[in-house]
Swiss-Prot record:
UniProt-recorded name of the protein: Adenylate kinase
Protein role: Catalyzes the reversible transfer of the terminal phosphate group between ATP and AMP. Plays an important role in cellular energy homeostasis and in adenine nucleotide metabolism.
Oligomer status and interactors: Monomer.
Entry comment, domain topic: Consists of three domains, a large central CORE domain and two small peripheral domains, NMPbind and LID, which undergo movements during catalysis. The LID domain closes over the site of phosphoryl transfer upon ATP binding. Assembling and dissambling the active center during each catalytic cycle provides an effective means to prevent ATP hydrolysis.
First-listed, main subcellular location of the protein, grouped into a coarse class: cytoplasm
Length: 181
């Protein structure tokens, strides 16, 4: 099963991705993990990403797309994956469709975790990270609404919304039900 997870920052996508990956028997693919792995292994893509990150810039989509393409073509992803943190934009979604099309494959589902903004702010402030101030969190929410929410229309027909409020296991049960599991 090939699944993309969407939702605002702090919606619990990373937590749910790990659980879904275990229950579906497919790898959890996170762009953050891909960046770290490529950088620590000093791959050509890792070195390219590092240059941007060192300058405080976002890693360009073409670099991210190539990392994702390499990862979804690894043997452990032959039967599917849970993608977390990608795609973030419609351009990245188009790139993913091409990558999967080249593999004679396509997405099975897009889960969108729905969490009210005030709940997101509370959750992220409770994590106690230095860079998680309320202003920063609300700005990340704005960026999500502007750049990532348009994916909901792009993936019309594949999107299943999941109530992301509640205990981790409750949300996971809802996510599995949404996938028909």
């Amino acid at each position: 099963m090939r699944v993309v997870l969407l939702g605002p920052p702090g919606a619990g996508k990373g937590t749910q991705a790990v659980l879904l990956s275990e229950k579906l028997g497919v790898p959890h693919i996170s762009t953050g993990d891909l960046f770290r792995a490529n950088i620590s292994q000093q791959t050509p893509l890792g070195r390219e990403a590092q240059k941007y990150m060192d300058a405080g810039d976002l890693v360009p989509s073409d670099v991210t797309n190539r990392m994702v393409e390499a990862r979804v073509n690894e043997p452990d992803a032959a039967n599917g994956f849970v993608l977390d943190g990608y795609p973030r934009t419609v351009d990245q979604a188009d790139a993913l469709e091409k990558i999967l099309g080249d593999m004679n494959s396509k997405l099975d589902a897009v889960l969108c975790f729905v969490v009210p903004e005030d709940t997101v702010v509370e959750r992220m402030l409770a994590r106690g990270r230095n860079d998680d101030t309320e202003d920063v969190i609300r700005n990340r929410m704005r960026v999500y609404r502007e750049e990532t929410e348009p994916l909901l229309d792009h993936y019309d027909g594949l999107v299943v919304t999941v109530d992301g409020v509640g205990e981790v296991d409750e949300v996971n049960e809802r996510a599995l039900r949404a996938l028909g599991r």
